[in-house]
């Protein structure tokens, strides 16, 4: 037998292992799908969950914290499946059974034997007892979480349900519940006392006399309970949790339905009826309580509980009272419920508002829930005739509940109870008139099936007429009242109430006769779907109506003749959307409409639904692709899939669409609007028309900007498929909407027009555009420019849309020489000439005023030549000039010029793109070229002189968008543009210094640089110049000028309130320089294959020499060591590409290229990330061994080492330590590297900038703290002068920056390190200068905090207090001054001790500095001390002062102290330079 058990165990273990392997295989196979769809397809943490549960029940936790951590992890894993709980089903038994067994063996049985800790054979320690109690408590908690995620109905089925378990579990439930109630009472009482105490009420008057003696006991015994509840109740093993009571009640609810009499389990239950004679409580004297009476008594108490305990006891009571042997108790319980409801209603009517009102509401909720569950699960005949008194009391109490503030919960339970009462009142037979789908025989045709259905319906109607009349007579009047209440709730504001009402409608109508049921359905259709679904409809009513119709359809109660009315309503509901300002309402309505479509698909036969199938499916496809909300798209996809599956062959291309546009793929909005649109658009007969109609009439005008942009892209893709239909049917409808008063309509129409034109250009279908359409599009620009909305709110979107239209117009090359003033609107008459003349005169006056204003502020105004001639000619020529201004080209030019000066960055970029295309397409005539030259000159002046930042930003963008190739600009003009752009990058004047202008200028220099390189390669191929002539060419010099400019731009470290904005310039400059290198290498390869006879090889080495490459690489390494992760990532990726460039010709003049390739390998780890400093910095620091990269890289690392981020400092230090540890095997090389590293530090201190002073001080201190460099200072080596010079440089820096408090505070640690660490060393220079630096900081009269910290460092010294000169008193005097003086006091209190200290330490230089830098108001000082003896006497007798001096200066000193205290505020002395503040 044992062998067989072993074999079975081994086989089970093998099966478990195989299942784990299979699970791992499933995980690997489903991993890709799970990542793509963001949906879980299996419980990935199942093995971990099993291990944690096993560890919990076997009490393997070593301490309480570990147990809490593991429990938290278990709960976290389970909570992840809250939206997909069914994935847990296969694991539930493996989780719940061990937990229930653990609770049963260690808690239930032990508790009933009163031997929780003493019956075990081994004595448990206190820690083990705590672990056991907390493990039991956490087991209950885990089971509750499972019930929350998966539902208690599923979880409770897995509990143990042996009859023998009933009494032990019930006993433990009673114990646990009473403990829970007592704990809550004690907490409430203590809370009341604490609130009264804080309110100032006398506790002696508040506490009753009989309670006074108990108060100390309560405080002593239960204060711990209350405190633990406030801190962390759920992890206190001595406190009963509500989860325990909840789970035990569910367990008893399973055990009470055992098919045995309670008397067979408990002798006290033999007299159940007599015991329950008084309401079933069994409280008679000397009488044993039965099981039922115990449960009833406990349940009635728990129905008013505020927690989830109420729900579990409601389930328990409903199952208990529905037992066949509990008829009497059931009637008594209903009677008790009626009396309780009446009592609560009477208290409310008598205005008896007291503290028990909340308990009354909770009790009513518990009663309603119990009755509803009992009516649902019980036998209908047991409740007949229904207690009308109960019904009346429930309807009366509804008014009280609606005013209680808990309407949502109570009304839901109220509706559930009402529908159950109605179901009991009605006959229990389902409606014979409902539609029932027949199974279609294989050989029958659809027409024959319709005939059969009609015959069946007619026969049923004839046979059931008399029965229907009888049923109508038997319908109680209360059903009308219930239906009226439910119909009102269909419009409720809460979704959960509408859902409950919809289900109630379906259940009740299913029991009604046909006439009455048809009336209810008619009311739903007429009352719920009122008004327009886009303007003024009630979203709640539409949502409730869709849900109700769906529930009716599922049950076949929506007869086929109603589909003619229902289907149009469904289609309207699929697109329900009401705009409310910056948002819209209607997603829940659209979702419910998809649910209704799903219900229709499941209910009706093909022959019934076929006339409506195609319109429903088409609209479902539209919703699944283009709805804004992901849940609506997925619901529509699921409904469409149901249509295809249930009605195979009737949905055109259904299988193809379902497989491509499935439930998961429509979840991605971009994918739906792009790739799926292209796929659906191929079905031009069935789906293309409705898709393009929806996009062109609804979606491009959506209130959401992102939807408008995506919809315009979809129209672009559909135009590729059927351009003729778009141009002829939809473009004429879209163009007029550019003149709408709504911003989102104007913007959407502009985007759609632009995308349509671009699509026509890409597919060579421009000929489809008629002249009329072209003129309509051109007129939109003219009309929009003159609108008020253009310059008001939303003007940015309109400008962007118009710029996109202009870009597309230039792309398809419209004729822009036409005079738009000659084009009249269809409704326009000739009588408007007077208005046109007045408008023209007004425009002329405005232009003159602008010109006058611009001349006064020395601002160039950009106008076309026609406008300039207007201002210079006589008034007789005004009309001709105005007509010139109406030419399309001039209108577009002026429009784009205006947008270039707009403050919005996106408007400027779109305008510059349109400008570039405008001149490249329309620059053929000399007049246009001269206009271009004027424009360039004007924008160069704007970039140089205009103080308007927006204008300079636009000008810097435009100068890079010039048509260099088509205009054949001269070298002088090109050089002028380059010089102005370079000047804008290095502006020092705050009025002209602008980060956006610098970024735009660099982008423009990139375009110009590419154009110049093209010229160089082109000229070299044509002329084949010698290398010397090539180096002397103007174009090459201009390119080198741009290269050097961008190299200098990498030093931009500007800071403003947005942070390190200079990083934008540094990043872009590096990218542009790298793009230049890539362009040269690419063209070098192409030129070598085409021109073999060239005397000069335009290689990368000739165009960019070794010095330029080295400087660029050094700069990249410097940026790679800086603190910004993004800059590091960009710089390191450029270095990697430069080293491993894949072109045939690589860059050979990179210093130490082969060694660098060994460090920065070609194929890095998949998970490697330059952003993570713990991975990137160790790799970067390996480059420190190359001397040419040492200084720049270390300079960049100082930004990280001296930063304020702790993790960045630690990673930098660890990386440098790791770098030096790589030379541990070679002491000589290690020594050399440390020397070179130290020299680099010295060079940095010699050349440090104001920006890097503070990071340099912090970096040197952090480096010295590693103790790597100590031997250079301790040993008498020649190299010790390096750190002596570093110390001297640091001293000079703080001596010249005495007003920079942040620098002074950061320098204290550095100088104290030199002073304390090396005070016992023989290096007198280090000791003297570090002491001198600390004394200099101590002498700072401006910042008390600096003096305080400096004095704290001096107190750590031992050298100052040791007698080295034979003088016994000097060290003690120094110690007395340092320790006894409060150095953060006011200046007048510390000035004398300070001078005395400096005199004792022979720091005459610092004494001179004190006299040269007095305080703001002179402080009366004592007569000068001329000897050491006099000083000693003064220190030993500090109170020996002249009385006259004190009396005469008393008032003056008080005034001085007051003034000094006022003037020495910290905020008044902060540095004015914001860069210093940003560094901190």
Swiss-Prot record:
Q: Where is the composition biased (Acidic residues)?
A: 464-476, 1469-1480
Instruction: Cite a single Pfam family from the UniProt record.
Output: TFCD_C
Give me the stretches of Low complexity compositional bias: 7-32, 453-463, 1444-1468
* Keyword entries, A-Z: Chaperone, Repeat
Biological process terms in GO annotation: microtubule cytoskeleton organization; post-chaperonin tubulin folding pathway; protein folding; tubulin complex assembly
GO function terms (MF aspect): beta-tubulin binding; GTPase activator activity
* HEAT repeats (start-end): 482-520, 886-922
Matching entries from Gene3D superfamilies are given as: Leucine-rich Repeat Variant
Q: Where is this region: Disordered?
A: 1-32, 453-476, 859-880, 1437-1480
Q: Where are the transmembrane segments?
A: none
Listed InterPro entries = ARM-like, ARM-type_fold, HEAT_type_2, TBCD, Tubulin_specific_chaperoneD_C
* Domain of life from the UniProt record: Eukaryota
Family of this protein: Belongs to the TBCD family.
Q: What does the protein in this record do?
A: Tubulin-folding protein; involved in the first step of the tubulin folding pathway.
- Whom does it interact with, and what assembly results? Supercomplex made of cofactors A to E. Cofactors A and D function by capturing and stabilizing tubulin in a quasi-native conformation. Cofactor E binds to the cofactor D-tubulin complex; interaction with cofactor C then causes the release of tubulin polypeptides that are committed to the native state.
The name of this protein is: Tubulin-specific chaperone D
């Amino acid at each position: 037998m044992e062998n067989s058990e072993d074999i079975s165990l081994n086989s089970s273990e093998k099966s478990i292992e195989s299942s784990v392997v299979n699970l791992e295989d499933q995980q690997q196979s489903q991993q890709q799908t799970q990542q793509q769809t963001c949906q879980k397809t299996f419980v990935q943490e199942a093995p971990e969950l099993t291990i944690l549960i096993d560890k919990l029940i076997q009490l393997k936790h070593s301490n309480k914290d570990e147990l809490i951590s593991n429990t938290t992890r278990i709960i976290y894993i389970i909570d992840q499946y809250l939206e997909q709980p069914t994935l847990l089903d296969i694991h539930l038994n493996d989780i719940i059974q061990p937990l229930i067994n653990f609770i049963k063996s260690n808690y239930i049985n032990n508790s009933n034997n009163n031997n929780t800790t003493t019956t075990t054979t081994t004595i448990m320690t206190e820690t083990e007892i705590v672990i056991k109690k907390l493990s039991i408590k956490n087991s209950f908690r885990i089971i509750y979480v499972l019930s929350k995620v998966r539902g208690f109905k599923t979880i409770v089925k897995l509990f143990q349900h042996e009859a023998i378990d009933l009494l032990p579990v019930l006993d433990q439930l009673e114990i646990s519940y009473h403990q829970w109630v007592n704990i809550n009472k004690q907490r409430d009482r203590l809370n009341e006392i604490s609130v009264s105490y804080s309110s100032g009420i006398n506790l002696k008057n508040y506490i009753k006399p009989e309670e006074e003696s108990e108060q100390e006991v309560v405080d002593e015994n239960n204060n711990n309970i209350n405190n633990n509840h406030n801190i962390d109740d759920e992890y206190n093993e001595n406190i009963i949790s509500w989860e325990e009571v909840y789970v035990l009640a569910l367990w008893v609810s399973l055990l009470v339905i055992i098919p045995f009499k309670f008397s067979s389990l408990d002798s006290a239950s033999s007299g159940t009826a007599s015991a329950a004679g008084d309401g079933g409580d069994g409280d008679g004297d000397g009488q044993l309580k039965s099981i039922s009476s115990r449960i009833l008594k406990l349940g009635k108490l728990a129905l008013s509980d505020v927690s989830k305990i109420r729900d579990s006891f409601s389930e328990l009571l409903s199952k208990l009272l529905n037992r066949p042997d509990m008829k009497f108790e059931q009637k008594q319980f209903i009677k008790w419920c009626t009396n309780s409801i009446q009592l609560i209603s009477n208290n409310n009517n008598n205005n008896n508002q007291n503290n028990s009102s909340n308990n009354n509401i909770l009790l009513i909720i518990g009663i309603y829930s119990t009755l509803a569950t009992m009516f649902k699960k019980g036998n209908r005949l047991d409740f007949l005739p229904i207690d009308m008194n109960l019904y009346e009391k429930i309807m009366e109490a509804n008014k009280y509940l609606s005013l209680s503030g808990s309407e949502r919960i109570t009304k839901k339970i109220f509706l559930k109870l009402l529908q159950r009462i109605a179901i009991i009142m009605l006959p229990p037979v389902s409606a014979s008139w409902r539609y029932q789908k027949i199974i279609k025989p294989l050989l029958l045709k659809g027409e024959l099936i319709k005939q059969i259905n009609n015959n069946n319906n007619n026969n049923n109607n004839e046979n059931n007429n008399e029965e229907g009349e009888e049923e109508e007579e038997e319908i109680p009047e209360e059903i009308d009242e219930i239906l009226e209440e439910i119909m009102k709730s269909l419009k409720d504001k809460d979704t959960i109430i509408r859902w409950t009402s919809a289900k109630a409608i379906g259940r009740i109508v299913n029991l009604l006769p046909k006439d009455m049921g048809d009336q209810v359905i008619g009311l739903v259709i007429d009352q719920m779907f009122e008004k327009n679904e886009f303007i003024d409809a009630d979203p709640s009513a539409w949502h409730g109506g869709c849900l109700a119709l769906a529930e009716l359809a599922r049950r076949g109660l929506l007869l086929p003749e109603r589909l003619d009315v229902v289907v149009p309503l469904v289609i309207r509901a699929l697109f329900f959307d009401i705009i409310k300002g910056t948002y819209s309402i209607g997603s829940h309505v659209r979702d419910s409409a998809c649910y209704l479509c799903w219900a229709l698909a499941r209910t009706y036969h093909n022959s019934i639904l076929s006339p409506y199938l195609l319109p429903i499916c088409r609209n479902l496809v539209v919703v699944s692709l283009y709805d804004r909300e992901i849940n609506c798209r997925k619901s529509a996809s699921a409904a469409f899939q149901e249509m295809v599956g249930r009605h195979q062959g009737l949905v055109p291309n259904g299988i193809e669409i379902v497989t491509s546009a499935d439930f998961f793929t429509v979840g991605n909005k971009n994918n739906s609007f792009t790739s799926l649109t292209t796929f659906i658009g191929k079905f031009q007969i069935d789906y293309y028309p409705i898709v393009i109609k929806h996009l062109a009439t609804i979606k491009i005008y959506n209130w959401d900007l992102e939807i408008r942009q995506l919809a315009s892209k979809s129209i672009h893709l559909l135009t590729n498929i059927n351009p003729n239909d778009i141009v002829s049917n939809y473009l004429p409808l879209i163009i007029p909407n550019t003149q709408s008063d709504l911003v989102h309509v104007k913007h959407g129409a502009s985007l759609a027009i632009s995308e349509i034109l671009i699509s026509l250009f890409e597919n060579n279908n421009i000929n489809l555009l008629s002249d009329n359409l072209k003129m309509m599009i051109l007129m939109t620009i003219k009309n929009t420019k003159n609108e008020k909305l253009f310059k008001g709110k939303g003007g940015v979107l309109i400008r962007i849309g118009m710029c996109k239209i202009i870009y597309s117009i230039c792309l398809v090359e419209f004729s822009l020489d036409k005079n738009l003033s000659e084009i009249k609107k269809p409704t326009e008459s000739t009588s408007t000439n007077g208005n046109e003349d007045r408008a023209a005169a007004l425009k002329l006056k405005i232009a003159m005023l602008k010109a006058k204003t611009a001349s006064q502020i020395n601002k160039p105004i950009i106008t076309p030549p026609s406008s300039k001639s207007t201002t210079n000619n006589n008034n007789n020529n005004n009309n001709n000039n105005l007509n010139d201004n109406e030419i399309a080209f001039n209108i577009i030019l002026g429009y784009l010029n205006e947008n270039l000066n707009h403050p919005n960055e996106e408007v400027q970029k779109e305008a510059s793109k349109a400008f570039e295309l405008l001149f490249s397409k329309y620059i053929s005539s000399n007049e246009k070229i001269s206009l271009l030259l004027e424009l360039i000159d004007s924008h160069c002046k704007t970039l140089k002189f205009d103080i308007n930042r927006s204008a300079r930003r636009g000008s810097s963008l435009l100068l890079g968008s010039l048509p260099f190739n088509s205009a054949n600009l001269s070298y002088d003009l090109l050089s002028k543009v380059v010089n102005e752009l370079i000047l804008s990058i290095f502006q020092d004047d705050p009025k002209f210094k602008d980060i956006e202008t610098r970024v735009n200028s660099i982008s423009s220099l990139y375009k110009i640089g590419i154009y110049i390189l093209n010229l160089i390669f082109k000229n070299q191929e044509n002329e084949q110049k010698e290398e010397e002539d090539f180096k002397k060419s103007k174009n090459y010099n201009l390119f080198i000028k741009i290269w050097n400019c961008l190299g200098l731009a990498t030093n931009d470290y500007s800071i403003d309130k947005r942070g390190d904005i200079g990083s934008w310039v540094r990043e872009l400059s590096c990218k542009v320089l790298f793009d230049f290198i890539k362009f040269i290498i690419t063209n070098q390869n192409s030129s070598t294959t085409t021109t073999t006879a060239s005397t000069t090889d335009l290689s990368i080495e000739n165009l960019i020499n070794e010095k330029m490459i080295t400087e660029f690489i050094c700069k990249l390494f410097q940026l790679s060591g800086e603190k910004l992760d993004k800059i590091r990532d960009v710089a390191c990726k450029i270095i990697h590409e430069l080293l491993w460039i894949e072109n045939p010709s690589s860059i050979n003049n990179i210093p130490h290229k082969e060694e660098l390739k060994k460090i920065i390998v070609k194929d890095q780890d998949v998970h490697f990330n330059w952003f993570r400093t713990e991975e990137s910095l160790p790799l970067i620091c390996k480059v420190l061994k190359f001397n040419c990269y040492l200084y720049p890289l270390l300079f960049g690392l100082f930004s990280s080492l001296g930063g304020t981020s702790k993790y960045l400092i630690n990673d930098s230090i660890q990386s440098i330590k790791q770098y030096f540890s790589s030379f541990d095997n070679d002491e000589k090389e290690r020594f050399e590297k440390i020397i070179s590293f130290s020299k680099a530090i010295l060079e940095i201190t010699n050349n440090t900038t104001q920006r890097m002073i503070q990071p340099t001080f912090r970096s040197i201190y952090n480096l010295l703290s590693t103790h790597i460099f100590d031997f250079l200072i301790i040993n008498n080596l020649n190299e010790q002068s390096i750190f002596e010079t570093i110390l001297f440089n640091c001293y000079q820096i703080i001596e010249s920056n005495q007003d920079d408090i942040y620098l002074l505070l950061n320098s204290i640690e550095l100088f104290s390190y030199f002073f304390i660490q090396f005070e016992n060393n023989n290096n007198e220079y280090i000791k003297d200068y570090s002491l001198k630096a600390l004394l200099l900081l101590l002498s700072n009269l401006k910042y008390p905090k600096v003096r305080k910290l400096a004095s704290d460092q001096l107190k750590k010294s031992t050298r100052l207090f040791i007698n080295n000169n034979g003088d016994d008193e000097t060290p003690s005097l120094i110690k007395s001054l340092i320790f006894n003086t409060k150095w953060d006091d006011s200046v007048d209190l510390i000035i004398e001790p300070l001078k005395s200290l400096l005199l004792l330490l022979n720091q005459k230089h610092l004494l001179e500095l004190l006299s040269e830098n007095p305080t703001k108001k002179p402080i009366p000082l004592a007569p000068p001390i001329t000897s050491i003896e006099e000083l000693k006497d003064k220190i030993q007798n500090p109170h020996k002062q002249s009385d006259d001096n004190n009396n005469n200066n008393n008032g003056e000193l008080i005034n001085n102290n007051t003034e000094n205290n006022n003037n020495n505020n910290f905020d008044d002395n902060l540095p004015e330079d914001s860069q210093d503040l940003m560094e901190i």
